[in-house]
Protein backbone atom coordinates (compact mmCIF):
# COMPACT_ATOMS: atom_id res chain seq x y z
CA UNK A 1 0.00 0.00 0.00
CA UNK A 2 1.29 3.49 -0.86
CA UNK A 3 2.79 5.37 2.09
CA UNK A 4 1.10 8.68 1.22
CA UNK A 5 -2.58 9.08 0.30
CA UNK A 6 -2.69 11.81 -2.39
CA UNK A 7 -6.29 13.02 -2.08
CA UNK A 8 -7.57 15.46 0.53
CA UNK A 9 -11.07 15.06 -0.91
CA UNK A 10 -12.76 12.20 -2.76
CA UNK A 11 -15.16 13.43 -5.43
CA UNK A 12 -14.82 10.94 -8.27
CA UNK A 13 -12.99 7.80 -9.37
CA UNK A 14 -11.93 9.52 -12.60
CA UNK A 15 -8.78 10.78 -10.87
CA UNK A 16 -7.91 7.53 -9.07
CA UNK A 17 -4.66 5.88 -10.05
CA UNK A 18 -4.18 2.12 -10.02
CA UNK A 19 -2.27 2.50 -6.76
CA UNK A 20 -5.14 4.50 -5.23
CA UNK A 21 -7.55 1.66 -5.97
CA UNK A 22 -5.13 -0.93 -4.61
CA UNK A 23 -4.62 1.05 -1.40
CA UNK A 24 -8.37 1.11 -0.79
CA UNK A 25 -8.84 -2.59 -1.57
CA UNK A 26 -5.84 -3.71 0.50
CA UNK A 27 -6.98 -1.70 3.50
CA UNK A 28 -10.58 -2.89 3.14
CA UNK A 29 -9.30 -6.46 3.06
CA UNK A 30 -7.36 -5.88 6.29
CA UNK A 31 -10.51 -4.58 7.96
CA UNK A 32 -12.37 -7.63 6.64
CA UNK A 33 -9.76 -9.94 8.15
CA UNK A 34 -9.99 -8.19 11.52
CA UNK A 35 -13.78 -8.43 11.56
CA UNK A 36 -13.71 -12.11 10.61
CA UNK A 37 -11.29 -12.69 13.49
CA UNK A 38 -13.82 -11.16 15.88
CA UNK A 39 -12.48 -7.59 16.06
CA UNK A 40 -15.43 -5.38 15.16
CA UNK A 41 -14.05 -2.08 16.45
CA UNK A 42 -10.57 -0.56 16.27
CA UNK A 43 -9.26 2.80 17.61
CA UNK A 44 -7.86 3.99 14.25
CA UNK A 45 -9.92 7.21 14.13
CA UNK A 46 -10.49 7.74 17.83
CA UNK A 47 -10.80 11.46 18.54
CA UNK A 48 -11.87 12.39 15.00
CA UNK A 49 -15.30 13.63 13.94
CA UNK A 50 -17.15 12.33 10.87
CA UNK A 51 -20.20 14.38 9.91
CA UNK A 52 -22.88 12.84 7.72
CA UNK A 53 -24.60 15.45 5.50
CA UNK A 54 -27.28 13.65 3.51
CA UNK A 55 -29.62 15.95 1.61
CA UNK A 56 -31.22 12.96 -0.16
CA UNK A 57 -32.89 9.87 1.25
CA UNK A 58 -30.55 6.93 1.82
CA UNK A 59 -30.62 3.63 3.66
CA UNK A 60 -27.51 1.71 2.61
CA UNK A 61 -24.96 4.46 2.03
CA UNK A 62 -25.78 6.63 5.04
CA UNK A 63 -25.93 3.79 7.55
CA UNK A 64 -22.90 2.10 6.02
CA UNK A 65 -20.76 5.24 6.34
CA UNK A 66 -21.90 5.85 9.91
CA UNK A 67 -21.24 2.25 10.89
CA UNK A 68 -17.83 2.39 9.18
CA UNK A 69 -16.92 5.51 11.17
CA UNK A 70 -18.06 3.93 14.44
CA UNK A 71 -16.04 0.77 13.77
CA UNK A 72 -13.00 3.03 13.45
CA UNK A 73 -13.95 4.63 16.82
CA UNK A 74 -14.69 8.03 15.26
CA UNK A 75 -17.37 10.30 16.69
CA UNK A 76 -20.33 10.54 14.30
CA UNK A 77 -22.46 13.64 13.81
CA UNK A 78 -25.70 13.20 11.84
CA UNK A 79 -27.43 15.99 9.94
CA UNK A 80 -31.22 16.20 9.50
CA UNK A 81 -32.21 18.61 6.68
CA UNK A 82 -35.79 19.06 7.93
CA UNK A 83 -34.64 20.44 11.30
CA UNK A 84 -31.66 22.44 10.04
CA UNK A 85 -31.21 26.10 9.07
CA UNK A 86 -31.81 25.09 5.46
CA UNK A 87 -35.47 25.64 6.28
CA UNK A 88 -34.56 29.27 7.05
CA UNK A 89 -32.77 29.81 3.76
CA UNK A 90 -29.20 28.82 4.64
CA UNK A 91 -27.21 27.57 1.64
CA UNK A 92 -25.77 24.09 1.40
CA UNK A 93 -22.25 25.48 1.27
CA UNK A 94 -22.79 27.57 4.42
CA UNK A 95 -24.18 24.49 6.16
CA UNK A 96 -21.01 22.57 5.27
CA UNK A 97 -18.80 25.45 6.44
CA UNK A 98 -20.70 25.51 9.74
CA UNK A 99 -20.04 21.83 10.40
CA UNK A 100 -16.40 22.29 9.46
CA UNK A 101 -16.16 25.12 12.00
CA UNK A 102 -17.60 22.74 14.61
CA UNK A 103 -14.56 20.54 14.08
CA UNK A 104 -15.62 17.97 11.50
CA UNK A 105 -12.60 16.12 10.16
CA UNK A 106 -14.59 14.59 7.30
CA UNK A 107 -17.87 15.65 5.72
CA UNK A 108 -19.66 12.76 4.01
CA UNK A 109 -22.03 14.48 1.59
CA UNK A 110 -24.93 13.33 -0.58
CA UNK A 111 -26.84 15.85 -2.66
CA UNK A 112 -28.94 16.04 -5.81
CA UNK A 113 -26.63 18.62 -7.46
CA UNK A 114 -23.79 17.27 -9.58
CA UNK A 115 -20.33 18.59 -8.63
CA UNK A 116 -21.57 20.17 -5.38
CA UNK A 117 -18.81 18.45 -3.39
CA UNK A 118 -16.21 20.19 -5.58
CA UNK A 119 -17.75 23.56 -4.70
CA UNK A 120 -17.84 22.78 -0.99
CA UNK A 121 -14.24 21.56 -0.98
CA UNK A 122 -13.14 24.68 -2.86
CA UNK A 123 -14.69 26.91 -0.18
CA UNK A 124 -13.12 24.88 2.62
CA UNK A 125 -9.69 24.96 1.02
CA UNK A 126 -9.98 28.73 0.46
CA UNK A 127 -10.17 29.25 4.24
CA UNK A 128 -7.45 26.63 4.88
CA UNK A 129 -9.84 24.29 6.65
CA UNK A 130 -8.43 20.84 7.33
CA UNK A 131 -11.83 19.23 6.75
CA UNK A 132 -11.99 16.59 4.00
CA UNK A 133 -15.02 16.09 1.76
CA UNK A 134 -16.15 12.60 0.76
CA UNK A 135 -18.75 12.39 -2.00
CA UNK A 136 -21.53 9.95 -1.08
CA UNK A 137 -23.41 10.64 -4.32
CA UNK A 138 -23.85 13.94 -6.18
CA UNK A 139 -26.59 14.25 -8.77
CA UNK A 140 -25.85 12.18 -11.86
CA UNK A 141 -22.10 12.69 -11.53
CA UNK A 142 -20.49 10.22 -9.18
CA UNK A 143 -20.83 7.74 -6.31
CA UNK A 144 -17.23 6.71 -5.57
CA UNK A 145 -17.80 4.43 -2.58
CA UNK A 146 -20.49 2.44 -4.42
CA UNK A 147 -18.21 2.03 -7.43
CA UNK A 148 -15.40 0.82 -5.17
CA UNK A 149 -17.54 -1.65 -3.23
CA UNK A 150 -18.97 -3.06 -6.47
CA UNK A 151 -15.48 -3.67 -7.84
CA UNK A 152 -14.30 -5.06 -4.51
CA UNK A 153 -17.23 -7.49 -4.55
CA UNK A 154 -16.27 -8.70 -8.04
CA UNK A 155 -12.59 -8.97 -7.13
CA UNK A 156 -13.44 -11.14 -4.11
CA UNK A 157 -15.65 -13.32 -6.28
CA UNK A 158 -13.09 -13.88 -9.05
CA UNK A 159 -9.93 -14.10 -6.89
CA UNK A 160 -9.13 -17.74 -6.24
CA UNK A 161 -6.29 -17.22 -3.74
CA UNK A 162 -4.86 -13.80 -2.92
CA UNK A 163 -7.06 -10.78 -3.53
CA UNK A 164 -6.06 -9.11 -6.81
CA UNK A 165 -7.92 -6.53 -8.94
CA UNK A 166 -6.01 -7.89 -11.94
CA UNK A 167 -8.60 -10.69 -12.11
CA UNK A 168 -10.89 -8.16 -13.82
CA UNK A 169 -8.59 -7.79 -16.82
CA UNK A 170 -10.46 -8.74 -20.04
CA UNK A 171 -13.57 -9.73 -18.06
CA UNK A 172 -16.79 -8.78 -19.85
CA UNK A 173 -18.94 -6.86 -17.36
CA UNK A 174 -22.52 -6.24 -18.44
CA UNK A 175 -24.29 -3.17 -17.01
CA UNK A 176 -28.04 -3.19 -17.65
CA UNK A 177 -30.42 -0.26 -17.43
CA UNK A 178 -30.57 3.48 -16.98
CA UNK A 179 -26.90 4.39 -17.33
CA UNK A 180 -27.65 7.95 -18.42
CA UNK A 181 -29.25 8.87 -15.09
CA UNK A 182 -26.96 6.77 -12.88
CA UNK A 183 -24.05 8.13 -10.85
CA UNK A 184 -23.34 4.53 -9.81
CA UNK A 185 -22.84 3.47 -13.42
CA UNK A 186 -20.45 6.35 -14.06
CA UNK A 187 -18.31 5.37 -11.08
CA UNK A 188 -18.40 1.73 -12.19
CA UNK A 189 -17.19 2.72 -15.66
CA UNK A 190 -14.11 4.46 -14.25
CA UNK A 191 -13.30 1.67 -11.78
CA UNK A 192 -13.90 -1.34 -14.05
CA UNK A 193 -12.03 0.14 -16.99
CA UNK A 194 -9.02 0.96 -14.79
CA UNK A 195 -8.36 -2.77 -14.40
CA UNK A 196 -8.91 -3.68 -18.03
CA UNK A 197 -12.49 -4.90 -17.87
CA UNK A 198 -14.46 -4.69 -21.11
CA UNK A 199 -17.81 -3.12 -20.30
CA UNK A 200 -21.05 -3.79 -22.17
CA UNK A 201 -23.82 -1.25 -21.61
CA UNK A 202 -27.24 -2.66 -22.41
CA UNK A 203 -30.54 -0.82 -22.55
CA UNK A 204 -32.72 1.33 -24.79
CA UNK A 205 -31.21 4.32 -26.55
CA UNK A 206 -33.23 6.72 -24.39
CA UNK A 207 -31.43 5.42 -21.29
CA UNK A 208 -28.04 4.70 -22.87
CA UNK A 209 -27.29 7.26 -25.60
CA UNK A 210 -24.66 6.35 -28.18
CA UNK A 211 -22.41 9.09 -26.75
CA UNK A 212 -21.56 6.84 -23.79
CA UNK A 213 -19.10 5.04 -26.05
CA UNK A 214 -16.78 8.03 -25.44
CA UNK A 215 -17.45 8.40 -21.71
CA UNK A 216 -13.92 7.52 -20.59
CA UNK A 217 -12.49 10.38 -22.63
CA UNK A 218 -14.15 12.95 -20.34
CA UNK A 219 -11.73 14.08 -17.60
CA UNK A 220 -12.67 15.12 -14.10
CA UNK A 221 -12.74 18.88 -13.35
CA UNK A 222 -9.19 20.32 -13.19
CA UNK A 223 -7.79 16.97 -14.32
CA UNK A 224 -5.15 17.40 -17.01
CA UNK A 225 -4.67 13.76 -17.90
CA UNK A 226 -6.00 10.32 -17.10
CA UNK A 227 -4.00 8.76 -14.21
CA UNK A 228 -4.67 5.31 -15.71
CA UNK A 229 -2.52 4.75 -18.78
CA UNK A 230 -4.60 2.01 -20.39
CA UNK A 231 -8.27 1.28 -19.82
CA UNK A 232 -10.72 -1.39 -20.84
CA UNK A 233 -13.34 -0.75 -23.49
CA UNK A 234 -16.99 0.30 -23.58
CA UNK A 235 -19.47 -1.15 -26.06
CA UNK A 236 -23.22 -0.60 -26.30
CA UNK A 237 -25.77 -3.32 -26.95
CA UNK A 238 -29.53 -3.14 -27.40
CA UNK A 239 -30.04 -6.91 -27.01
CA UNK A 240 -29.98 -8.24 -23.46
CA UNK A 241 -30.11 -11.87 -24.58
CA UNK A 242 -27.03 -11.53 -26.80
CA UNK A 243 -25.16 -9.61 -24.10
CA UNK A 244 -25.87 -12.18 -21.39
CA UNK A 245 -24.42 -14.97 -23.54
CA UNK A 246 -20.93 -13.44 -23.38
CA UNK A 247 -20.98 -11.76 -19.95
CA UNK A 248 -18.68 -12.72 -17.08
CA UNK A 249 -20.66 -10.63 -14.57
CA UNK A 250 -23.79 -8.48 -14.54
CA UNK A 251 -24.56 -5.22 -12.76
CA UNK A 252 -28.27 -4.36 -12.82
CA UNK A 253 -29.28 -0.73 -12.31
CA UNK A 254 -32.50 0.41 -10.65
CA UNK A 255 -35.07 1.72 -13.09
CA UNK A 256 -36.21 5.09 -11.79
CA UNK A 257 -39.95 5.14 -12.41
CA UNK A 258 -39.92 8.88 -13.04
CA UNK A 259 -38.40 8.09 -16.46
CA UNK A 260 -41.92 7.16 -17.52
CA UNK A 261 -43.00 10.73 -16.78
CA UNK A 262 -40.20 11.99 -19.01
CA UNK A 263 -41.45 9.87 -21.92
CA UNK A 264 -38.16 7.96 -22.06
CA UNK A 265 -39.97 4.61 -21.95
CA UNK A 266 -43.18 3.46 -23.59
CA UNK A 267 -44.11 1.44 -20.48
CA UNK A 268 -42.62 -0.27 -17.45
CA UNK A 269 -43.93 -3.61 -18.72
CA UNK A 270 -42.20 -3.30 -22.09
CA UNK A 271 -38.93 -2.32 -20.40
CA UNK A 272 -39.17 -5.29 -18.05
CA UNK A 273 -39.89 -7.62 -20.95
CA UNK A 274 -36.86 -6.43 -22.93
CA UNK A 275 -34.35 -5.65 -20.18
CA UNK A 276 -35.58 -7.23 -16.95
CA UNK A 277 -33.25 -9.94 -15.62
CA UNK A 278 -34.97 -13.32 -15.29
CA UNK A 279 -33.82 -16.92 -14.71
CA UNK A 280 -34.74 -17.69 -18.32
CA UNK A 281 -32.45 -14.99 -19.66
CA UNK A 282 -29.65 -15.99 -17.29
CA UNK A 283 -29.87 -19.56 -18.59
CA UNK A 284 -28.47 -18.27 -21.90
CA UNK A 285 -25.08 -18.10 -20.20
CA UNK A 286 -23.42 -21.45 -19.54
CA UNK A 287 -21.82 -20.20 -16.29
CA UNK A 288 -23.38 -19.12 -12.99
CA UNK A 289 -22.10 -15.57 -13.31
CA UNK A 290 -22.23 -13.05 -10.43
CA UNK A 291 -25.16 -10.62 -10.30
CA UNK A 292 -24.86 -7.22 -8.61
CA UNK A 293 -27.39 -4.46 -7.93
CA UNK A 294 -26.63 -1.24 -6.00
CA UNK A 295 -30.13 -1.11 -4.51
CA UNK A 296 -32.84 -0.31 -3.81
CA UNK A 297 -34.37 -3.03 -5.97
CA UNK A 298 -37.56 -2.80 -8.00
CA UNK A 299 -38.55 -6.45 -7.85
CA UNK A 300 -40.32 -7.59 -10.97
CA UNK A 301 -39.11 -4.64 -13.05
CA UNK A 302 -35.33 -4.67 -13.61
CA UNK A 303 -34.85 -8.00 -11.83
CA UNK A 304 -37.19 -10.77 -10.69
CA UNK A 305 -37.54 -11.97 -7.11
CA UNK A 306 -36.52 -15.44 -8.26
CA UNK A 307 -33.11 -14.12 -9.35
CA UNK A 308 -32.67 -12.05 -6.18
CA UNK A 309 -33.71 -14.80 -3.76
CA UNK A 310 -32.68 -18.04 -5.46
CA UNK A 311 -29.87 -17.44 -7.95
CA UNK A 312 -26.70 -18.82 -6.29
CA UNK A 313 -24.37 -16.00 -7.30
CA UNK A 314 -26.63 -13.04 -6.63
CA UNK A 315 -24.23 -10.89 -4.59
CA UNK A 316 -26.51 -8.05 -3.50
CA UNK A 317 -26.10 -8.75 0.21
CA UNK A 318 -22.36 -9.21 -0.31
CA UNK A 319 -22.27 -5.69 -1.75
CA UNK A 320 -23.96 -4.29 1.34
CA UNK A 321 -21.51 -6.11 3.62
CA UNK A 322 -18.50 -5.05 1.54
CA UNK A 323 -19.58 -1.43 1.70
CA UNK A 324 -18.53 -1.20 5.34
CA UNK A 325 -14.81 -2.10 4.98
CA UNK A 326 -14.57 -0.05 1.78
CA UNK A 327 -15.96 3.02 3.54
CA UNK A 328 -13.76 2.36 6.56
CA UNK A 329 -10.79 2.42 4.20
CA UNK A 330 -11.84 5.72 2.62
CA UNK A 331 -12.42 7.43 5.97
CA UNK A 332 -9.09 6.15 7.27
CA UNK A 333 -7.13 7.22 4.19
CA UNK A 334 -8.55 10.75 4.25
CA UNK A 335 -7.34 11.14 7.82
CA UNK A 336 -3.97 9.77 6.75
CA UNK A 337 -3.76 12.61 4.22
CA UNK A 338 -4.55 15.19 6.90
CA UNK A 339 -1.82 13.84 9.15
Curated annotation (Swiss-Prot):
Subunit structure: Heterododecamer (2C3:3R2) of six catalytic PyrB chains organized as two trimers (C3), and six regulatory PyrI chains organized as three dimers (R2).
This enzyme's EC code(s): 2.1.3.2
Domain of life per record: Bacteria
Top-level enzyme category: transferase
Organism whose genome encodes this protein: Prochlorococcus marinus (strain MIT 9312)
One GO term of the biological process aspect: 'de novo' UMP biosynthetic process
Binding site for carbamoyl phosphate: 60-61, 110, 143, 146, 295-296
PROSITE patterns for the chain: CARBAMOYLTRANSFERASE
Key word Transferase present: yes
GO molecular function, one term: aspartate carbamoyltransferase activity
Catalytic reaction(s) noted: carbamoyl phosphate + L-aspartate = N-carbamoyl-L-aspartate + phosphate + H(+)
Protein name: Aspartate carbamoyltransferase catalytic subunit
Binding site for L-aspartate: 88, 183, 254
Keyword Transferase assigned: yes
Biological role stated in the UniProt entry: Catalyzes the condensation of carbamoyl phosphate and aspartate to form carbamoyl aspartate and inorganic phosphate, the committed step in the de novo pyrimidine nucleotide biosynthesis pathway.
InterPro entries: Asp/Orn_carbamoyltranf_P-bd (IPR006132), Asp/Orn_carbamoylTrfase (IPR006130), Asp/Orn_carbamoylTrfase_sf (IPR036901), Asp_carbamoyltransf (IPR002082), Asp_carbamoyltransf_Asp/Orn-bd (IPR006131)
Cellular-component GO terms for this entry: cytosol
Family: Belongs to the aspartate/ornithine carbamoyltransferase superfamily. ATCase family.
NCBIfam families: asp_carb_tr, PRK00856.1
Pathway entry: Pyrimidine metabolism; UMP biosynthesis via de novo pathway; (S)-dihydroorotate from bicarbonate: step 2/3
Native organism taxonomy: Bacteria, Bacillati, Cyanobacteriota, Cyanophyceae, Synechococcales
UniProt keyword terms in alphabetical order: Pyrimidine biosynthesis, Transferase
Amino acid sequence: MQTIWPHKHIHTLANFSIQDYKSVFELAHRFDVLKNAGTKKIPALQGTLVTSLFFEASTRTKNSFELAAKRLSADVQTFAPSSSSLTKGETIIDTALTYSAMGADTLVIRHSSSYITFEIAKKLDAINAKTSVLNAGDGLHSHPSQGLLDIYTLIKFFSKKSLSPDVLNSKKILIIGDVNHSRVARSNLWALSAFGADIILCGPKTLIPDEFINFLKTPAPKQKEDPVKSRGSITISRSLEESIKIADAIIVLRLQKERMMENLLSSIDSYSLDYGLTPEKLSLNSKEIPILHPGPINRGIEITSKVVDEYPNCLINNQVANGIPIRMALLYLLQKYNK
